Amino acid sequence: MKKYAKYPALAVTLAIMAVIFVLSSQPAELSTKVSRAVTETVQASRIKTITPLWFSTTNLNANVRKWAHIYIYCALGVSMAVTVQLWLHRVTLRQKALLASALCMLYAAGDEFHQYFVPGRAAQLSDVVIDAMGFLPCVAAVYLVLWAVRRLRN
């Protein structure tokens, strides 16, 4: 079964990477329009959630952009961890977790470098840190679950 699961896992990972690339390729004006539309939807729906202290309602648009980074990189982290798990053999879980995290970090840094060349956009180290806040816990969660399953089986 794992033999056939690795191709869809890779396809999902590449699809998420493509979505990130397309969104990062948007000029500043279009990117701002999209995030403002999401912000207006959030404000209109009056979603009540438990949010961290740094989440300020006065600057909701900036926070929507930060959370978008976290969510999309969380998805990338999970899919990358699953893909690495399915494709690599004879490698420890720790090494796989480190590789999945490193690949996500490289993609996040590359994404910021790419944005440097997009009109009106800038490369920011803070965005890479925010991206890491998305993928690191998710990669860790995948490998903690795999570790726990292995411990229960033995």
Named regions from a protein language model:
Residues A15-I20, K96-Y116:
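Small-polar-interrupted transmembrane alpha-helices in polytopic inner-membrane proteins
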Residues A108-A132:
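Interfacial helix-loop-helix junctions of multi-pass membrane proteins
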Residues A5-V12, Q95-L103, S126, I130:
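Alpha-helical transmembrane segments of integral membrane proteins
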Residues M1-M80:
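"…centered on the first transmembrane helix and the immediately adjacent amphipathic helix/loop
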Residues Y73-W87, M133-V149:
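Membrane-interfacial alpha-helical segments at the cytosolic side of multi-pass membrane proteins
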Residues K2-A5, W87-R94:
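Membrane-interface helix-boundary motifs at transmembrane edges
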